Amino acid sequence: MPEITIQELFDRMPEAFLPEKAGDVDAVIQFHLSGEEGGDWAVTLRDQKCVVEDDIVVENPTMTLTADAQDYKNVILGKMDPMAAFMQQKLKLKGNLNLALGLLKYFKMD
């Protein structure tokens, strides 16, 4: 079975979103991913909903995550520890870092 693509990961985010875990989060997260499957995505978490926009760069996001697409995919799929990826600068974060700490909890990962 082929490995999931980055686009599929983003497409699945709204259905994997756990509003009960996110609570009253109100944030826009900009993803800048480089490499073979790279691109720009904006994920808005607001009013207990998750909205994903493809091929967009937003002004003044709450947080920006920059990474190689494969490294990001490895974190999401549990093949790479998120904290280790951050410490090794494979994931670069700018903005509200508390949001980054909670982000993985807001989504069903199976």
Question: Which residues does each predicted region cover?
Answer:
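Feature captures hydrophobic
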Residues: 1-110
